[in-house]
């Protein structure tokens, strides 16, 4: 399902011109007990008039299946909405991957390397549960130009149960949109994950035109929901932007946003048309999926 969403695969996919080298063993011919040991091959993938090539090697061990594949993609587009990435049609690209699957049906993506022109996405030790949710990962590297023609250079690296997020440039607009819409049905991570992301990014776009500089701090998740945050950054004119999230003893999530330069925030979220200057102080208290918010606008 995960690869179907990335590659936009549908029921019209056909596999042809396949060459296979199969190794197997039989413990009893009378019982027709045949065990696949390995499979090596290459095929062409054909869908809606588009043709691409895949080479693969599959091995079946005691309690584990391992797959190594190289996919050459030219015709087919690739879209990753969460990070605003798109590979257009008729652009040479490749995906190299190695994954293992165990008897519990969880999948470990040992390595994925995607390359297309000057774009590269790298994932290491990404573990996916049988429900298609992410359990954890070791490293993610993003180096690409997105659909908004903005450069992205970001590294997310595991540190025990937490993650360190560093980079020079990143367009966070789609992740912000996703966070505002997130619910229990579309969570990326497994429900019992408790993680802290320590952030240090030089330049973060909140939309195509507006950005903040030197974003530092941390955000924390409890049971896959944001429950703590302490982030500070600066707009290009030097004005500070602060975001704080805390969980009270009554299980209330209190969110506070403060800045003396509200124009980019107002443009991004359309709080009040025409409001450009002054002080923006936003506070929200959420409990049991019910939010009560107060927006204070002063000195404008």
Q: Where do the PLM segments sit?
A:
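Membrane-proximal interfacial segments on either side of biological membranes
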Residues: 1-300
């Amino acid at each position: 399902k995960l690869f179907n969403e990335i590659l936009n695969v549908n029921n019209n996919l056909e596999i042809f011109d396949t060459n296979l080298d199969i190794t197997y063993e039989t413990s009893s011919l009378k019982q027709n007990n045949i065990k696949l040991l390995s499979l090596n091959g290459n095929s062409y993938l054909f869908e809606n008039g588009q043709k691409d090539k895949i080479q693969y090697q599959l091995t079946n061990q005691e309690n584990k299946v391992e797959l190594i594949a190289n996919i050459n993609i030219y015709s087919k587009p690739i879209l990753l909405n969460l990070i605003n990435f798109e590979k257009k049609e008729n652009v040479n690209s490749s995906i190299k991957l190695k994954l293992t699957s165990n008897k519990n049906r969880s999948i470990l993506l040992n390595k994925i390397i995607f390359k297309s022109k000057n774009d590269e996405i790298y994932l290491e030790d990404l573990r996916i549960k049988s429900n298609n949710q992410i359990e954890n990962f070791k490293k993610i590297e993003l180096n690409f130009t997105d659909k908004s023609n903005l450069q992205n250079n970001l590294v997310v690296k595991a540190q025990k149960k937490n993650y360190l997020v560093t980079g020079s440039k990143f367009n966070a607009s789609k992740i912000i949109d996703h966070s505002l819409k997130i619910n229990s049905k579309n969570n990326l991570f497994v429900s019992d994950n408790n993680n802290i992301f320590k952030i240090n990014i030089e330049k973060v776009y909140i939309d195509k035109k507006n950005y903040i500089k030197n974003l530092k701090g941390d955000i924390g998740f409890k049971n896959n929901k944001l429950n703590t945050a302490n982030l500070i950054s600066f707009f290009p004119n030097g004005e500070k932007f602060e975001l704080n999230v805390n969980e009270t003893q009554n299980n209330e999530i209190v969110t506070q946003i403060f800045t003396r330069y509200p124009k980019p925030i107002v443009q991004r979220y359309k709080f009040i048309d025409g409001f450009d200057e002054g002080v923006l102080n936003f506070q929200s208290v959420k409990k049991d999926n019910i939010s009560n918010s107060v927006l204070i606008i002063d000195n404008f």
